[in-house]
């Protein structure tokens, strides 16, 4: 497992998202937790984003660290997320992690589904 530094065009983990991850990890009392972002088939546009907390990191995972917390992406998902921004937003619709993905040609109105 290696931690690599990426330019903002590779995968951006915003300060807002990192702060929220740090808060949630602190609430759980388990500093081994990392935010895992993944892409699966499904949703109304063909692919959908998923978020989970994970203690484990595979050897070929990509890890992006900010503010002492980590975002983890598996190699299959990374090919769809290269150049994307992972952020955390609060609004009238509620609070959630969101992905701004320049690779997506169409997105669903909910923002969790996309196509390439």
Swiss-Prot record:
GO function term, MF aspect, one: 2 iron, 2 sulfur cluster binding
InterPro entries reported for this sequence: FeS_biogenesis, FeS_cluster_insertion, FeS_cluster_insertion_CS, FeS_cluster_insertion_RrpA, HesB-like_dom_sf
Pfam family, one: Fe-S_biosyn
Disulfide pattern: none
Domain of life, source organism: Bacteria
Cofactor(s) named in the record: iron-sulfur cluster
One Gene Ontology cellular component annotation held by this UniProt entry: cytosol
Keyword match Iron-sulfur: yes
Keyword field: Iron, Iron-sulfur, Metal-binding
Binding note for cofactor: Binds 1 iron-sulfur cluster per subunit.
GO annotation (BP), single: iron-sulfur cluster assembly
Binding site for iron-sulfur cluster: 44, 108, 110
Stretches of the chain forming a coiled coil according to its record: none
UniProt family annotation: Belongs to the HesB/IscA family.
PANTHER family: IRON-SULFUR CLUSTER ASSEMBLY 2 HOMOLOG, MITOCHONDRIAL (PTHR43011:SF1)
Free-text function comment from the UniProt entry: Required for insertion of 4Fe-4S clusters for at least IspG.
Assembly and oligomerization: Homodimer.
HAMAP family: Fe_S_insert_ErpA
Name the UniProt record assigns to this protein: Iron-sulfur cluster insertion protein ErpA
Species whose genome carries this gene: Pseudomonas entomophila (strain L48)
Taxonomic placement: Bacteria, Pseudomonadati, Pseudomonadota, Gammaproteobacteria, Pseudomonadales
